[in-house]
Swiss-Prot record:
Keywords: Cell inner membrane, Cell membrane, Membrane, Symport, Transmembrane, Transmembrane helix, Transport. The gene is dctA. It is found in: Cell inner membrane. This is Aerobic C4-dicarboxylate transport protein. GO terms for molecular function: fumarate transmembrane transporter activity; malate:proton symporter activity; succinate transmembrane transporter activity. It comes from Salmonella typhimurium (strain LT2 / SGSC1412 / ATCC 700720). It is a multi-pass membrane protein. Responsible for the transport of dicarboxylates such as succinate, fumarate, and malate from the periplasm across the inner membrane. Belongs to the dicarboxylate/amino acid:cation symporter (DAACS) (TC 2.A.23) family.
C-alpha cells in the first residue's frame, strides 16, 4: 500500500507543493528562481492541448449518428453555462456586499501606482464582444494550432467533424487515422504528467518566494472571503446540481483529485484540460459531449473567475470609497455577464477581464486595480480549482440532459466499483 501511495501522482504533487512552499518561504531568492520549472510544465501542457481537442471533438462528432445531436448538445451547454455563471456572479456580489472586506481602508486612488496596472489596462482595451467573436475565427488553421487558441481550434474541429461525418464510409480511413493519432497524443500526455510534481514545485516555490506569505496579511480579508465563497459555491451550488443529476460532488472531487492538485500547483485550470477530457469520458460521458463541453467551458463557464470578478470590483469600490448604488451594481453585473465570457482558463486572464470591466463600467478608478495586483496570484488558485470542478460538473449535467450519460458507469466509477459489482480501487 505504501509503495502505491508514493507512486501515485496525487501524493507526488501534494509533496512537491509542500516542498515548494517551504523553499519559497525560507529561501525566497532561490524559490523565485524556480519559476522556469513551473513555466516549462505549463508550456508542455499547452503544446498538447490543441491536438487533444481536435482529435476528441472530430472523433466524437464524426462518430455520432445524428448531427442534430451535436447542435442540441451545444445549445444545452451554452444555456447551462449562462445560468450557472450568472449564479456565480450574483453570489460573489451578495457576499462582498455583506462582508465588505474593503470597507475602512480609505484608499485615495491618486496615491496608487497606476503604472503597475498599465499593461493590464492596455490589454483590457482590446477586450470587447465583437473583438472576442472575431477572434474565434482563425486567420488560418495552422495559426489556430500554433497559437493554441482553444475556441479557434474547437471551431475548426467542429467543422472538420461535420464534414467527415458527411463523407460516411469514404471518410472511415481518415477517422481511423485521427483515432489512432489520438491514442498517441494521450500517450504523450501520460509522459508529460510524470513531470507534474516538478512543475507544481517550481510554480509554488516561485509564488511564495516572490510575493511572500507576509503579503497576504494586509489584504487577507478579501482572500479569505473569496476562498470561502468559492468553497460554498462548490459545496452548495454545484453540490445541489450534482445531487439533482444523481451523483455526489464530494465523490466527484475525489475522482479528479490529481487534476485538482495539478491546478493548485500551476494556478491554471488549463493545465488539467487534457486529462479532464479523458477522465470525463471514463466517467460515462459520451466523447462528443466531453469534446464540446470541456473546451467551450474554458471560455464560457468559468465559475471561479465569475465570483472573483464581482468580489474584486466591489472590493475596489469599497476600498477607494467609490459609492456603488444598486443601479451601479446591476450595471456591473450586466457588463460582467458579457466580459467574463472572454476569460480563458490561463493564469492572469481574470485580472485582464477585471481591468476591462472596470474600464467599461466607468464608475470605478482603474488605478484601484493596483490594490489587488499583488494578491491576485494568490487568488488564482481558488479561481482555477472552482473553474475545473464547475466544468466537470457541467459535462455530466449536459451529458444527462442530452441522454448521452452512462449512469451505471458513473455510479461504478465514483463508488470505486467494478462493472461486476465488486468494490476495488479504480485508478485515477
Amino acid at each position: 500500500m505504501k509503495t502505491s501511495l508514493f507512486k501515485s501522482l496525487y501524493f507526488q504533487v501534494l509533496t512537491a507543493i509542500a516542498i515548494g512552499i517551504l523553499l519559497g518561504h525560507y529561501y525566497p531568492e532561490l524559490g523565485a528562481q524556480m519559476k522556469p520549472l513551473g513555466d516549462a510544465f505549463v508550456k508542455l501542457i499547452k503544446m498538447i492541448i490543441a491536438p487533444v481537442i481536435f482529435c476528441t471533438v472530430v472523433t466524437g462528432i464524426a462518430g455520432m449518428e445524428s448531427m442534430k445531436a451535436v447542435g442540441r448538445t451545444g445549445a444545452v451547454a451554452l444555456l447551462y453555462f449562462e445560468i450557472v455563471s450568472t449564479i456565480a456572479l450574483i453570489i460573489g456580489l451578495i457576499i462582498v456586499n455583506v462582508v465588505q472586506p474593503g470597507a475602512g481602508m480609505n484608499v485615495d486612488p491618486a496615491t496608487l501606482d497606476a503604472q503597475a496596472v498599465a499593461v493590464y489596462a492596455a490589454q483590457a482595451k482590446e477586450q470587447g464582444i465583437i473583438a472576442f467573436l472575431m477572434d474565434v475565427i482563425p486567420g488560418s488553421v495552422i495559426g489556430a494550432f500554433a497559437s493554441g487558441n482553444i475556441l479557434q481550434v474547437l471551431l475548426f474541429a467542429v467543422l472538420f467533424g461535420f464534414a467527415l461525418h458527411r463523407l460516411g464510409s469514404k471518410g472511415q480511413l481518415i477517422f481511423n487515422v485521427i483515432e489512432s493519432f489520438s491514442q498517441v497524443i494521450f500517450g504523450i500526455i501520460n509522459m508529460i504528467m510524470r513531470l507534474a510534481p516538478i512543475g507544481a514545485f517550481g510554480a509554488m516555490a516561485f509564488t511564495i518566494g516572490k510575493y511572500g506569505v507576509g503579503s497576504l496579511v494586509q489584504l487577507g480579508q478579501l482572500i479569505i472571503c473569496f476562498y470561502i465563497t468559492c468553497i460554498l459555491f462548490v459545496v452548495v451550488v454545484l453540490g445541489t446540481i450534482a445531487r439533482v443529476t444523481g451523483f455526489s460532488i464530494f465523490k466527484f472531487i475525489r475522482y479528479i483529485r490529481e487534476e485538482l492538485l495539478i491546478v493548485l500547483g500551476t494556478s491554471s485550470s488549463e493545465s488539467a484540460l487534457p486529462r479532464m477530457l479523458d477522465k470525463m469520458e471514463k466517467l460515462g460521458c459520451r466523447k462528443s459531449v466531453v469534446g464540446l463541453v470541456i473546451p467551450t467551458g474554458y471560455s464560457f463557464n468559468l465559475d471561479g473567475t465569475s465570483i472573483y470578478l464581482t468580489m474584486a470590483a466591489v472590493f475596489i469600490a469599497q476600498a477607494t470609497n467609490s459609492h456603488m448604488d444598486i443601479f451601479h451594481q446591476i450595471t456591473l453585473l450586466v457588463v460582467l455577464l458579457l466580459s467574463s465570457k472572454g476569460a480563458a482558463g490561463v493564469t492572469g486572464s481574470g485580472f485582464i477581464v477585471l481591468a476591462a470591466t472596470i474600464s467599461a463600467v466607468g464608475h470605478l478608478p482603474v488605478a484601484g486595480l493596483a490594490l489587488i495586483l499583488g494578491i491576485d496570484r494568490f487568488m488564482s488558485e481558488a479561481r482555477a480549482l472552482t473553474n475545473l470542478v464547475g466544468n466537470g460538473v457541467a459535462t455530466v449535467v449536459v451529458a444527462k440532459w442530452v441522454k448521452e450519460l452512462d449512469h451505471q458507469k458513473l455510479d461504478d466509477v465514483l463508488n470505486n466499483r467494478a462493472p461486476d459489482g465488486k468494490t476495488h480501487e479504480i485508478s485515477s
